[in-house]
């Protein structure tokens, strides 16, 4: 089932672990990075949008600093990340330039995705980069996060990015073949699971530990990441990054690794999240034309269609869209605060900059962040 979905998927998150970008922990393997760039270039030629979540900054920093073992102290890890992140970003930029592709570095913290305003900003930035045919390369901003609020590992970060931009598929590449019925290093009869639902209660007991001393995430974290990605409807494939041309072969529908299936499609999951899981902070009243546009045309909500703003909401918070009779017809994420919305309501989008002095978005609520009730 997922093989065909992977073939038809337009937006893919690819996560590569430290063991797949370093030379056994002794710094970045630029030849390997070039291989990932080449495969992603081929995926893009197939019409796919690809976001790369890459580990490797700490490992590269350790090599630069001459450290043989991964430090336990957070401040030392942050120092290694600060040293290594520059080399990681430059190495990827050089590799992708061989295929005439631009890259963009994005460093995220948990606060960026828990704050509604910063969540919306991060989402808009990544989607804009994809529209510009640029490859976003994402990592956790290790240099500033505290141990209590870190993502935990890049498996979890990749899943959250899948949630953020509604990716259809998350591909987690590791140094293991996939999910087995047991730890193959301990159980000779363990077999590779080709396909399983993320809601299967047995998958956590099947997950083993990490096989590398360089990274942080073991199979357990990959299963948890798959479950998190499934909340927004994304399927996950866990496969070995050692398989030749693994990304291209997966995109062509070849059965490699383990597919963990989400229980609902991306669009359905997104609509349920918008409708049921966000606290509404305010509302806007729409004129008849705007109401018709939302209900029948699948349009975004523009400021010109708003006749009244109620409540005190901020950018990125959920608001209700009411018709002139006061009935809620839609719900979505506001691109502007209540104060800003009041200033630009009843005005064409072309006047937003003149009124506010800047333009965040041309829509008050974008259709991708809107659900009809």
Swiss-Prot record:
Q: Which residues bind ATP?
A: 15, 174-175
What does this protein do, in the record's words? Catalyzes the transfer of a phosphate group to glutamate to form L-glutamate 5-phosphate.
GO biological process, alphabetically ordered? L-proline biosynthetic process
Output this protein's name: Glutamate 5-kinase
Q: Which residues form a coiled coil?
A: none
Q: Does the keyword Lipid biosynthesis apply?
A: no
The entry's keywords: Amino-acid biosynthesis, ATP-binding, Cytoplasm, Kinase, Nucleotide-binding, Proline biosynthesis, Transferase
PANTHER family in the record: GLUTAMATE 5-KINASE, ISOPENTENYL PHOSPHATE KINASE
- Domain PUA spans what residues? 281-359
Q: In which pathway does it act?
A: Amino-acid biosynthesis; L-proline biosynthesis; L-glutamate 5-semialdehyde from L-glutamate: step 1/2
Provide the residue positions that the database annotates as binding substrate.
Answer: 55, 142, 154
Pfam families, alphabetically?
AA_kinase, PUA
The record's EC number reads 2.7.2.11
Chief location of this protein within or outside the cell: cytoplasm
This enzyme catalyses:
L-glutamate + ATP = L-glutamyl 5-phosphate + ADP
Main EC class the enzyme belongs to:
transferase
Cite the InterPro entries for this sequence.
AceGlu_kinase-like_sf (IPR036393), Asp/Glu/Uridylate_kinase (IPR001048), G5K_ProB (IPR041739), Glu/AcGlu_kinase (IPR001057), Glu_5kinase (IPR011529), Glu_5kinase/COase_Synthase (IPR005715), Glutamate_5-kinase_CS (IPR019797), PUA (IPR002478)
Kindly state one GO CC term assigned in the UniProt record. cytosol
Molecular function via GO: ATP binding; glutamate 5-kinase activity; RNA binding
The organism of origin for this protein: Nitrosomonas eutropha (strain DSM 101675 / C91 / Nm57)
Subcellular localization, as worded in the UniProt entry: Cytoplasm
Family note: Belongs to the glutamate 5-kinase family.
Coding gene? proB
